[in-house]
């Protein structure tokens, strides 16, 4: 398991997310969001935790950091940050906002 943490933007990626974490947090019961390949800006008003089920995306921060997230990754985005999403392969994720 690899964990990537950037202290400037506080994005946490756990790759791959373990089955025990998925069960512990009830991730499979979270809502699902899907998107076809595209590029768009997104502002996180609330913290988001998501599990990428399918696909891949490149996420760029305002200060130039680029992350590639893919199926199996658990990603935590802090509130208050702006990102550019570039969906490179149709993506599907479970997500939870807040807390």
Spans of model-derived segments:
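Ligand-binding loop in jelly-roll beta-barrel domains
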Residues: 79-99
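Conserved short histidine dyad/triad with adjacent acidic residue
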Residues: 16-18, 26-45, 78-79
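Short hydrophobic/aromatic-rich beta-strand segments that constitute the beta-sheet cores
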Residues: 42, 59, 93-96
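Double-stranded beta-helix
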Residues: 3-10, 29-31, 92-99
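Short acidic-glycine-tyrosine-enriched beta hairpin
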Residues: 63-79
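Transition segment at domain starts
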Residues: 3-24
């Amino acid at each position: 398991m690899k964990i990537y943490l950037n202290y400037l933007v506080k994005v946490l990626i756990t790759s791959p997310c373990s089955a025990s974490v998925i069960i512990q947090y009830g991730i499979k019961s979270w809502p699902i969001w899907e998107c076809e390949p595209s590029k768009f800006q997104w502002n996180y008003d609330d913290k988001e935790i998501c599990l990428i089920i399918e696909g891949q995306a490149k996420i760029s921060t305002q200060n130039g950091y680029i992350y590639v997230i893919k199926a199996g990754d658990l990603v935590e985005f802090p509130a208050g940050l702006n990102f550019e999403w570039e969906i490179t392969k149709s993506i599907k994720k479970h997500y939870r906002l807040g807390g």
